[in-house]
């Protein structure tokens, strides 16, 4: 039986900052909030367009370890979100207007980092028209 992706979870030192980035810059909508004992959010779940799975932003209790991204290094390579090929220029403009530094581009993917330093890609294939 084939498996489907349920969710991807990212631990965030600054949950509110991460949520703003994914909502305001990338346009993801909040599906659900999980409260934290003592107030605030413990976790925020964000929807992805196809409704298959979700992105969970989790409050981290400790600061991140220094882990600069490097190709070929073991660990999470990137979180890739699908965009339609005809919308690529719109996304390039949106990232620039939001002050997001694009670190690399290929024929199919725009690479950048979220506020926590996680590598994110907006990707398409040539036949995604």
Task: Describe every region a protein language model picked out.
Residues 105-107:
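Short, small/polar residue-rich loop motifs at catalytic or cofactor-binding pockets
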């Amino acid at each position: 039986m084939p498996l489907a992706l349920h969710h991807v979870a990212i631990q965030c030192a600054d949950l509110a900052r991460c949520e703003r980035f994914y909502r305001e810059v990338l346009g993801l909508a909040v599906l659900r909030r999980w409260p934290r004992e003592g107030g605030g959010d413990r976790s925020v779940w964000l929807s992805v367009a196809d409704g298959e799975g979700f992105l969970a932003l989790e409050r981290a209790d400790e600061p991140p370890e220094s882990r600069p991204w490097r190709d070929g290094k073991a660990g999470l390579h990137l979180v890739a979100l699908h965009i339609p090929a005809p919308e690529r220029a719109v996304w390039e403009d949106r990232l620039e207007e939001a002050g997001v530094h694009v670190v690399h581009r290929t024929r199919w993917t725009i690479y950048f980092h979220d506020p926590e330093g996680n590598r994110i890609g907006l990707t398409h294939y040539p036949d995604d028209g």
